[in-house]
Design a protein with these regions (language model features):
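Short polar catalytic/cofactor-binding loops
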Residues: 8-13
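Short N-terminal helix/helix-N-cap motif within the alpha/beta-hydrolase-1
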Residues: 15-16, 130
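Ribokinase/PfkB-type carbohydrate-kinase core domain
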Residues: 1-5, 62-64, 93-193
Length: 193
């Protein structure tokens, strides 16, 4: 049976409208796609990380409720899970502030086996973060070796536009790995100016 394996960030998004919090929901670029696939009944596995706190429990429970296998989610017992504050304007466009508390050694999990029938999803800043690059490449190399479909969701935010030149070799390497690339006009504008 075909499986979708995603690697990426999980975060609790707290949305603000008129400077008032309105809702808190788990999110993340790859995460959101996996939730939709899990709800549709697809066989979904997620490789990610959360803190061993109440927010981490909320995120893990949300994943399980939406059909996502969490066996490859690293839980850091003495850390806080990441959160983002999303301030929505009158057009519902968001301006983000991120708060993270990761250890220096990250994502110390065994990667799931990948078969030729699988689809591997990766993306966002998580896919180009130097501290995680070896783990991301480990999964991508497995996927490439067996002929799995590799889907790259660029999701390159304006907050990282000033780093685009420094990150470009990794971004281009991700393009080379990918069979399918998804990105918005804004993503590519942030990367290439």
């Amino acid at each position: 049976m075909r499986r979708v394996i995603g690697i990426g960030e999980t975060i609790l998004d707290i949305l603000f409208k008129n400077n008032q919090p309105t809702v808190a929901v788990p999110g993340g670029s790859v995460f959101n796609g996996l939730v939709s696939l899990g709800r549709a009944g697809a066989n979904v596995t997620f490789i990610s990380e959360v803190g061993g706190d109440h927010v981490g429990e909320i995120i893990l429970n949300f994943m399980k409720e939406n059909g996502i296998n969490t066996d490859s989610v690293m839980v850091y017992p003495d850390r806080k899970s990441p959160i983002s504050l999303a301030f929505l304007n009158e057009k519902n466009d968001a301006e983000y502030s991120f708060y993270k508390d990761y250890p220096s050694l990250r994502l110390d999990v065994d990667m799931p086996e990948v078969t030729s029938d699988d689809i591997v999803m990766f993306g966002s800043f998580y896919a180009i973060t130097p501290q995680l690059r070896d783990k991301v490449k480990e999964l991508l190399d497995k996927a490439r070796k067996v002929g799995a479909i590799i889907y790259y969701d660029v999701n390159f935010r304006s907050t990282h536009a000033h780093e685009a030149i420094k990150l470009m070799p990794t971004i281009l390497e991700n393009f080379e790995y990918a069979d399918i690339v998804r990105g918005s006009t804004e993503d590519f504008g942030n990367m290439f100016g």
